Amino acid sequence: MDKRVILAVAGSGKTYHICHMIDPSKRNLLLAFTNENIHNIRNELCDAFGSVPELTTVMTYDSFVYRHLINPYEPSIAEHFNCLSFVSNGICTIDPPPKQISTSRGRIIANRRYTPKDKLEHYITKSKQYYCATLSELAMQVKKGSESLVKRAAARLNLFCDQIFIDEFQDFREHDFDLIIELSKHLNSVLLVGDYYQHSVSGTNNSGKPFKIKKNEVCYNDFVATLKSAGFEVDEETLRKSRRCTTSVCNYVKEKLGIQIESANDAQGEVLWCDDSAEAILDNPDILKLVIQKAADYKFNAMNWSYSKGDTFSSVCVILTDKFDNMDDEEFTTKGIATSTINKLYVAMTRSKGNLYLMKSSTFKKIKDAYIIK
């Protein structure tokens, strides 16, 4: 079996690499976490082949799980939970009832609407729609005799797919991640591509396994070890160079954030602290400003650090938070700063294909009021 993971860096062309390495004569299945990722994949395939190849299918991960692991095996699901008359009514995106809830006084109590995972009602609404959020958990739960649903589904996928690709796999957590690992054990050919250091950046799906176990953060080396123990060949070389960021930017990210990133870019672009010209930078419409949050509150052209993920700009100014105010010091360290915050800054600092301007929080606070929309 061919099971590979390519660990990439920002701007290395993850989606480009996947879309240009496929064999259009084979039955390819390309999966990604968000609709935006799917849109990017389709565009890249059109650039590479003129259109999406006839034998290539592109879909979101949730659609994949529903179509290939849930819907075809509904009779087995009904039998597993001893609900033989069960017939589903589609799927919904509302969240299932949580196990615990908070009272008006802040007390954490058991939720009476919660149903344990050994009951079918844990996975469906009262109108018999599957909860999108528990699809992977359901797929992992069901067995027919001694054979798991996952193993049966993998055998079926091997009949109809020559290669399966999963883009931005760092976005998958908890049961989604577990399902990918378990399914991959039985697939003939699967390739995962993602950037470890872009985990915990999106607005949702930011907690838990594989990047956090209980209260402990999982470091890069431990994550690689987890993938290898699951039987994956881990490639840390193919996409280690950024096609977007200049050498100066990559070196600065490596020095300050400890992230191993190199440049494949010959373009000119420097890292410039702009505290002495802060107002001129903020007033320049050609320089996108990246802020930690509430970008819409400002008069200047701005975007939140995390929302800029996947984008490329000619030049950006990253407005730092208090914890990074001394990043220009030789003694600066990220020790004590939350991993999710470091990763969001990494995303922000790697958006520019030219100059990267950095502005201290202390500088911005002095002039901030003049730029707030009132």
Pin down the residues of each PLM region.
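The feature marks helicase ATPase cores and/or their adjacent C-terminal helical subdomains
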Residues: M1-K374
